[in-house]
Amino acid sequence: MSTAEQRLRLMQLASSNLPVGGYSWSQGLEWAVEAGWVLDVAAFERWQRRQMTEGFFTVDLPLFARLYRACEQGDIAAAQRWTAYLLACRETRELREEERNRGAAFARLLSDWQPDCPPPWRSLCQQSQLAGMAWLGVRWRIALPEMALSLGYSWIESAVMAGVKLVPFGQQAAQQLILRLCDHYAAEMPRALAAPDGDIGSATPLAAIASARHETQYSRLFRS
C-alpha cells in the first residue's frame, strides 16, 4: 500500500462518519454537566484534559501499543490478555458496554474490508475497537504512531462534539478546543506509547462516578 493510500485510510478511520457509534456515548460528561461540574468551555477543557492525561494516556495508548505489537507478532494470547486488561480498566458497566459495542461495530467493518481476517482475531476485535484498530493497522502496514494519531483525533473530536450538545458551546469554540487538545495530544503521545507496564492504569474517579450515575440519569441524550 502506498503512502498516499495509507494516509487516506487514516483519514477514513478518524472520520466522524465511521459507523462505530462514537457519538452515541458521552463517557460521563452528560452527568458531569447536570451535576454542575462542567458548566462552560473552560471547565470542559479542564475536564477533557484530565481524561486525556489520566486516562487515555495511561490506559488506552499504552494498551493500544501492546495490542499493535501483539498483532505484529501474531501473538493472539498476548492480544487477548491485553484486551481483557483494557476491559478491566473500564470502571463502569456503561464504559465496558461502550467498549464492546464499538468493538462489535468495528468488527463488522473489518469483515467487509478484510474478509480474510482469521476467526480468532475477528472474535477478539469484537470485544474492543482498540484491538480491531491494532490488527487493521498492522494489516495495512500503517505504523503505530500514525494509527495512534488517528485514534486520538477521533476520540478528541467525539468528546468535543458531545460538549457542543451538552455544555453547550458553539462550533467556533469547538474548533478552537480541538486545536488545543490536539496540540496537547501530539506533545504527550510518544511518552504514552512508551509507558512501562507498571504505569498502566487510570486515575479519573470523577469520570467513573459520572459514568455510573449516568446509567440511571432521568433524562439522557447519550447511550448508557
Curated annotation (Swiss-Prot):
Spell out where the chain crosses the membrane. none
Where mainly located? cytoplasm
Q: Where in the cell is it found?
A: Cytoplasm
Q: Does the keyword Cytoplasm apply?
A: yes
**Keyword annotations from UniProtKB, A to Z:** Chaperone, Cytoplasm, Nickel insertion
InterPro entries assigned to the protein according to its UniProt record, in alphabetical order: UreF, UreF_sf
Q: Which residues form a coiled coil?
A: none
Q: Does the keyword Chaperone apply?
A: yes
Q: Which GO terms describe its cellular component?
A: cytoplasm
The record's misc note reads: The artificial UreEF fusion protein binds to UreD-UreABC apoprotein complex, and UreG can also bind to this. The UreF portion seems to function normally in nickel transfer, while the UreE function is impaired in the fusion.
**Family classification:** Belongs to the UreF family.
Q: What quaternary structure, including any partners, is listed in this protein's UniProt entry?
A: UreD, UreF and UreG form a complex that acts as a GTP-hydrolysis-dependent molecular chaperone, activating the urease apoprotein by helping to assemble the nickel containing metallocenter of UreC. The UreE protein probably delivers the nickel.
* Protein name per Swiss-Prot or TrEMBL: Urease accessory protein UreF
Gene designation = ureF
